[in-house]
């Protein structure tokens, strides 16, 4: 994805977050025939205020073009992350936000979870109806080892025992992400 594509997606995410927080009319996706913007791939949109997470929502599987997925995930990240229902993003906070978009590769199941590459691979761990994920950048931001990355995903995201990733009945998937972002106020 080139810089022009990233700029379009970041502007679309910023404009969407602004509209949903200020209660103005929803955006229509920019018209594009560009294969990078119309590809069906999963994505996450992350909003931070300084080092503080303010929302992070995404989908692994896309049922619509990427540009539309970014709009939906930006809306959900701004208003639908249950971790922040008690402290929603305010209009006065918008210029302090940073937006990060992670465009995902398809999930690939692995029988060897320790084959993951820290800082390159994200993980999705599923057992029964429980599941949780970490984006690739979480390993870099936390400095965790592979075992810690897998264990924290099990215990803090999926609600499983920390060592559930070692169980043959637990499904572990790897994915990569193209990650880019910008300060809210710097996006033009």
Explain the meaning of each model-derived region.
Residues 1-188:
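Basic nucleic-acid-binding interfaces
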